[in-house]
Design a protein with these regions (language model features):
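Anionic-ligand binding patches
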Residues: 2-5, 11-199
Length: 199
């Protein structure tokens, strides 16, 4: 395929997605290349709706096939929170540390076995035709009592993956891309592209 727009200006996210799909497209853009689009209002009622909003708005503006993702961190003992508000759990215009600190405070005193959680990533694709679709990736884990590691972004330092025995923030990018919620969703996205376009 010729080109695609990743409907995000988050450098970490764009890099993670580009790493896995670069061989499928001759040119990959991000919202950094279309700054005039501005911030896309994510007012859906689910991560699926928010992802489709981003990919549709981006396609409508660029007329280039667009892919977007939205991710929720769902903590069982918090009834699925932060959920839809994962990126702004501690408020608007906050840092990753602000969000993690609020989460750790909310779970203060909760034993490890009750700190189960999952990352859920939904990726949507819009090309203006009949090929719009979505895929989902889920990574199960636990919320640590304190931050571990300095790699990655978002909640990675507090998300522990039992199968690997480490937090996402202590994994190399290769390992993380292989097992992460976004990595799983991107692999499903690539499979769907293969089916639709015989890439």
């Amino acid at each position: 395929m010729k080109e695609i727009v990743i409907a995000s200006s988050n450098k970490h996210k764009v890099s993670e997605i580009t790493h896995k799909i670069h061989s499928y497209f001759q040119k990959i853009y991000s919202l950094e290349d279309f700054a005039e689009i501005g911030d896309i209002k994510e007012d859906g009622n689910s991560v699926l709706e928010n992802s489709f909003i981003k990919s549709r708005v981006t396609f409508d503006y660029t007329n280039i096939p667009s892919v977007a993702d939205d991710t929720a961190l769902e903590v069982d003992i918090l009834n699925g929170d932060p959920g839809l508000y994962t990126a702004r759990y501690a408020g608007e215009n906050v840092t990753y540390d602000d969000n993690m600190n609020k989460l750790l405070n909310a779970m203060d005193g909760v034993p490890f076995e009750e700190r189960t959680a999952r990352f859920r990533t939904v990726i949507t694709y819009v090309d203006g035709g009949t090929n719009d679709f979505f895929v989902e990736g889920i990574l199960e884990g636990h919320i640590l009592e304190e931050k571990q590691g300095h790699l990655g972004f978002g909640y990675d330092p507090v998300f522990f993956v039992p199968e690997k025995g480490m937090s996402l923030a202590t994994m190399s990018s290769d390992i993380k891309n292989e097992i992460s919620h976004r990595g799983i969703a991107i692999d499903k996205f690539k499979n769907k592209i293969d089916q639709l376009f015989n890439v």
